[in-house]
Amino acid sequence: MAAAEQVENWLSSRGFRTFPFHDGRVRYVALPAMPPTSVAANAYFFSIDSDLVYWNFFLDFGPLNLGQLYRFCAKLNAALASPKLRGRTIYFYSGTHPHRRTNAAALLSSWAIIFLNQTPEEAYAPFRGATPGFTPFHDATPIACSYNLTVYDCLCGLYKAKNLKFFDFDTFNVDEYEHYEQVENGDLNWHQEGKWLAFAGPHENSEMTRDGYQTLTVDDYGPYFQQKGVTLVVRLNKKYYDERKFLKYGIRVLDLYYLDGSNPPRAILDQFLREVEGNAGGIAVHCKAGLGRTGTCIGCYLMKHFKFTAAEVIGWFRICRPGTIIGPQQHYMAEMEQVMWREGDLYRQRKANEDKEEARPGDKEVVEGMLGSLETLALGAKATAPEAKRSKRHSAKQAADVESSTAAEEAAEEEGKMTQGDELRAMRARNMHGGGGGGMGIRRK
């Protein structure tokens, strides 16, 4: 009997089902412990359960982040390329806990998408019909989650991001990723390399907050942003720093504050989309923790311009930056999906029409164009007054909303209450340096 068959017989006789990948050269199995040496010697078994650890905020347990996915893929690829393991089946195994199984399935299927160039359907096919099924991922809250984000959702988001070249593991700098995700180094992650960056909000001074979070200043971020081509910072939270300090780095700041933990009012989302659509450089977005409001606004842009589904956005963003998009924001994304798709179609149609009109007109068209312009100016003069009034009313309402939201947040702070952003920052600080033990990156032995 061949060695591979002996291992399979041993596993199946004990009720352990294996899931084949790469024509059976790679298999996944959930095991309570490593098989005995007499069995394991006939194959190659490896696990990442104790090496790649997801440090949760609350009840969330995955998916593992982009740096951890990279390290998993590197480990598996090294085993496949090893001359010592030629001809031997490679078993990737995890513990039997539902969270372990779900994260393992996400890792291996993601590897198949990235390195076998498979579609989400192909990459997830070996796991179809797995019993028990895989537990949906939970958002970064301490209460029951009413939005089911599946392994397959994450795969679809990863697949779309890969095809759009939002990341490239051939050039991915895992050390840089793990460095800048640390609180003291920036607490930042790229959702689209070179274009969209999410980070925790800077403060006027660098200090340790009452919740144990190390704040950073504009000067901590400025040089890195300048190096990476960031030209716009969007601030979605209350003002904690002088935005003029970003100017010396060639970066302007757009203020679009709304209440922590909530969904963007339509006027704010519209202004966000208009501003970023006209920005040529990289865009860094922050709220308090850089997770909820930040992910929601960037996600709407991706739905509008790249036709991501809401689930694809959430899945991809949580791989990039764990904990992104929280609670009601998940359902808001689902509600905005079709809206953003329609607006994206109209945007692209309008741009296409504008491109056609840029062709130089003939003499007749020039004259007609001049006459039309004069008519437009005349009509515009009549319409200026009421239009200005509407704009003024809109600005006044937005200012009143900001003032109301700021007052509510300041009142909560005075009472010693923590907002969603405060709680997330506190848990992140704990994970990086305290009770969690090893951060969201690699825990090395």
Model-derived features: where do they sit?
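Polar/charged alpha-helical tracts
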Residues: 9, 13, 125, 230, ...
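Conserved G/P- and acidic residue-centered "switch" motifs that form tight phosphate/ATP-binding loops
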Residues: 290
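Long, low-complexity intrinsically disordered regions
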Residues: 360-445
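Intrinsically disordered, low-complexity regulatory segments enriched in Ser/Pro/Gln/Gly
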Residues: 338-366
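Short cysteine clusters
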Residues: 287
